[in-house]
Amino acid sequence: MQDFQKYLSTAPVLATIWFIILAGLLIEINRFFPDALLVPMK
């Protein structure tokens, strides 16, 4: 169990988990506010 916790605390694993969370958050924001990520063209 200690080896598994050490594996989870390594940088590539933490970066992968962080990017999955960030991507999910951006997808949900884009679902409710579809034009929020676009620059308004005037």
Curated annotation (Swiss-Prot):
Domain of life, source organism: Eukaryota
SUPFAM superfamilies reported for this sequence: Subunit IX of photosystem I reaction centre, PsaJ (SSF81544)
Subcellular location, record wording: Plastid, Chloroplast thylakoid membrane
Disulfide bonds: none
Main location: plastid
InterPro entries assigned: PSI_PsaJ, PSI_PsaJ_sf
Keywords, comma-separated and alphabetical: Chloroplast, Membrane, Photosynthesis, Photosystem I, Plastid, Thylakoid, Transmembrane, Transmembrane helix
A Pfam family reported for this protein in Swiss-Prot or TrEMBL: PSI_PsaJ
GO annotation, cellular component aspect: chloroplast thylakoid membrane; photosystem I
Transmembrane segments: 7-27
Topology versus the membrane: Single-pass membrane protein
GO biological process assignments: photosynthesis
Alphabetized Gene3D superfamilies for the sequence: Single helix bin (1.20.5.510)
Family according to the record: Belongs to the PsaJ family.
Main function: May help in the organization of the PsaE and PsaF subunits.
Protein's recorded name: Photosystem I reaction center subunit IX
Organism: Mesostigma viride
Taxonomy of the source species: Eukaryota, Viridiplantae, Streptophyta, Mesostigmatophyceae, Mesostigmatales
Designated gene of the protein: psaJ
